[in-house]
């Protein structure tokens, strides 16, 4: 990003994830007065970024997304939920909002646990989630970077058969 800014670019389109977006906005775009627009960075932390009017996004903040996911959980009559999230800005931010929102709906949160992306096997993570219990497991992450593995390990072990999935779990 520094390279294109030094070449006089008028604006930056990106980045695609919240952590990278926050770093580029804070360290490159805003200090250099360059407009930055992210189509997919959703972390609630970006809402309070001291952007001096230079940072925008076209996807809604997870501050709203977490509430919608909690409403969906309530509508599905889930009474207790285990939450696992990808261990990054997106996952942590959405998990925090979701946890508060489901609790506000009177839904018991049995556990909240981070998971690392890209592992070959998630059976130990699922065992930890299952030991806490829950009518369902909320998987806040990415389909191709751990989410699918958590679902598969849950089904294979019989730990969970109901899933609440975040927007990052959409894939082909």
List each model region and its residues.
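Extracytoplasmic ligand/sensor domains, especially the bilobed periplasmic-binding protein
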Residues: 2, 9-113, 162-172
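Extracellular/periplasmic bilobed ligand-binding domains
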Residues: 29, 95-172
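Generic helix-packing signal
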Residues: 4-5, 70, 129, 158
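Active-site pre-lysine segment of PLP-dependent enzymes
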Residues: 3, 24, 124, 128
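Short acidic/histidine-rich motifs immediately flanking catalytic phosphotransfer sites
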Residues: 4-11, 131-136
């Amino acid at each position: 990003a520094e390279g294109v800014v030094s070449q006089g670019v008028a604006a930056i389109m990106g980045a695609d994830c919240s952590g990278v977006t926050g770093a580029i906005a804070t360290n490159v775009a805003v200090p250099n007065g360059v407009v930055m627009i992210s189509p997919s960075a959703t972390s609630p932390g970006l809402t309070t970024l001291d952007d001096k009017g230079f940072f925008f996004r076209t996807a809604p903040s997870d501050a709203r997304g977490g509430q919608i996911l909690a409403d969906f959980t309530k509508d599905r009559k889930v009474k207790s939920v285990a939450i696992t999230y990808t261990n990054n800005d997106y996952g942590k931010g959405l998990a925090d909002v979701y946890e508060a929102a489901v609790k506000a709906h009177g839904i018991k949160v049995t556990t909240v646990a981070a998971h690392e992306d890209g592992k070959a096997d998630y059976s130990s993570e699922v065992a930890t989630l299952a030991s806490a219990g829950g009518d369902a497991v909320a998987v806040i992450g990415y389909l191709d970077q751990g989410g699918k593995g958590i679902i598969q390990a849950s089904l294979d072990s019989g730990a969970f058969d109901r899933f609440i999935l975040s927007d990052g779990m959409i894939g082909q």
